[in-house]
A protein has these predicted regions:
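Calycin-type beta-barrel ligand-binding domains and close structural analogs
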Residues: 5-132
Length: 132
């Protein structure tokens, strides 16, 4: 059976200077919520009190000349204990029709232990947009 690699909730907050802060939240029994993008009712039992902020993993997104938003987590501030790594750097690009996520995880000796393949994972928009 396939198991999700990462179950998270992302909270986006707009800032007065035009940037967007993306905070990463975790939940207990994360695999219980696998597939909630397809079946939102899976989230009905989840309360805000159950969510935990992943300190240091915030991404500040800035609008680029292309119109997409791009940013990354602060190097050395997002802790992980997965796959022999101790720190994770996440790069994120959000455009009107796609999201691209690139992960790089390093050990205490600054050696890359794992990461997204190539240029990262690209998620394409499917379906119609609101109002169409």
């Amino acid at each position: 059976a396939q198991r999700p690699f990462r179950q998270r909730i992302y909270r986006f907050s707009s800032l007065p200077d035009g940037r967007i802060l993306m905070a990463e939240l975790t939940m207990p029994r994360a695999t219980d919520f696998a597939g909630a993008w397809r079946r939102p009712e899976l989230l009905d039992s989840l309360t805000p009190q159950q969510l935990s902020l992943r300190q240091g993993c915030e991404i500040w997104l800035t609008r680029q000349a292309s119109g997409e938003y791009a940013g990354h987590s602060k190097v050395g501030s997002c802790a992980t204990d997965f796959g022999g790594a101790t720190t994770l750097v996440q790069y994120l690009w959000i455009g009107p029709n796609s999201v691209r996520l690139l992960d790089r995880a390093y050990d205490n000796g600054a050696r890359q232990r794992w990461g997204s393949p190539g240029e990262g994972y690209v998620y394409l928009r499917k379906g119609m947009r609101r109002g169409e």
